[in-house]
Amino acid sequence: MSLLLEEIIRSVEALLKLRNRNQEPYVDPNLNPVLLVPGIAGSILNAVDHENGNEERVWVRIFGADHEFRTKMWSRFDPSTGKTISLDPKTSIVVPQDRAGLHAIDVLDPDMIVGRESVYYFHEMIVEMIGWGFEEGKTLFGFGYDFRQSNRLQETLDQFAKKLETVYKASGEKKINVISHSMGGLLVKCFMGLHSDIFEKYVQNWIAIAAPFRGAPGYITSTLLNGMSFVNGWEQNFFVSKWSMHQLLIECPSIYELMCCPYFKWELPPVLELWREKESNDGVGTSYVVLESYCSLESLEVFTKSLSNNTADYCGESIDLPFNWKIMEWAHKTKQVLASAKLPPKVKFYNIYGTNLETPHSVCYGNEKMPVKDLTNLRYFQPTYICVDGDGTVPMESAMADGLEAVARVGVPGEHRGILNDHRVFRMLKKWLNVGEPDPFYNPVNDYVILPTTYEFEKFHENGLEVASVKESWDIISDDNNIGTTGSTVNSISVSQPGDDQNPQAEARATLTVQPQSDGRQHVELNAVSVSVDA
């Protein structure tokens, strides 16, 4: 019997979807603007030719990806400015600004057809927010940036300040809700720490998602030593080799700023472990194997020795790319900025972090049967991870340690990038962004809804009959007040099921009431009842 009611409801839902298929997206003019800030590798990057002004996408692309990546993206750090500068003197890297900045952070390779979902970044969130009533260029914006650079590079911070001002003016001088993902949270926090007055002037809420506030220890350790973890799960879509990526990252301040925070009080401090072969002092040349353990500061010596003879071939020229202590010094000052940053009194902060996935925390190279004999060969070893709870990239402990007075910190089971299209995250954002009618029964911290007692569905037995009733309603949202009826309309629907040996005879009837449209909404209500012979 209940199947008949479900059939009626599905029919009405299909009718409503058909009816709304060609309508313009609903726009809510009362929403405060949102600015989306991606993490590392989360922005499309173009190379501009200085001679003819032509632009071509170098991150992300399919054809000639590795060659163009090495030619246009490889760079060297300039300690006098804190900027990493492309090796190619004839080109410079820029971020496309189409669609109010959203193009660069939406789909990272717009040309990809098969497997397109694999290069989505903020795509699902953008689509969801447009469905809530946000409008590109008026209440929805993106801030892509050159993720090779330091999170406190003044050039990037100036661009962010300009973006905040642009969003503020474009939305009619409404205060901004900033939503950052991953390393984007470090960029926002650096800006807040260094330009607190500007941040407070333009921003009302900051929501950080999966931010590595105290670093991503296991992930970055293996990235610096051989580039492995950075391309795991990405290389088949980004078409860039492990070594090409590694040689880029070794000169990226942003990577060093993601290293383990050594002065944070970790519940279990991250370590680098090496199985080493040692020569004995017995005079006969025998050796033994020992497991060595290095804390985060001690491991810097291993990085230095391991990368001491690291070189790259650039256009026929051999370039030395050792562990860069100048970048390390710069990154140390960045961590000081992050540690001292305070939340302005008028800004609210929310923290969403990923949980329930094994996340690299400490890293081990070699084993008893195959120890590391020469540190310069460490790059050829596969790492073994000692994992903790997190999102697969950022440990939960790091993501939670924002050091700010948060309105809420909420853990969501999910993967580092996948969390951006999680329905639970969407519900939290709707709540904190004040989208739609407020739900007084929804608690984002626990992510469940407490509903008052209702009698929307009733079922009872009487005189050998089973009777069930259901009531359901929908709101059709449209910004065109001319659509729909001028008065209420009432229609009826009926479905019957003949009886047989397996199923009793049953019949369901429903009344569909469509109210006239008002303020962009049209209310539809269904009342249905079914009757069957009680078997």
Swiss-Prot record:
GO terms for biological process: phospholipid catabolic process. The active site is at 182 (acyl-ester intermediate), 391 (charge relay system), 416 (charge relay system). InterPro entries: AB_hydrolase_fold, LACT/PDAT_acylTrfase. The keyword Acyltransferase applies. Residues 488-507 are annotated as: Disordered. It comes from the Eukaryota. Residues 488-505 have a biased composition (Polar residues). The keyword Manganese does not apply. GO terms for molecular function: O-acyltransferase activity; phospholipase activity. Its EC number is 2.3.1.-. Keywords: Acetylation, Acyltransferase, Transferase. Pfam families: LCAT. GO terms for cellular component: cytosol. The modification N-acetylserine is found at residue 2. Belongs to the AB hydrolase superfamily. Lipase family. This is Lecithin-cholesterol acyltransferase-like 4. It comes from Arabidopsis thaliana (Mouse-ear cress).
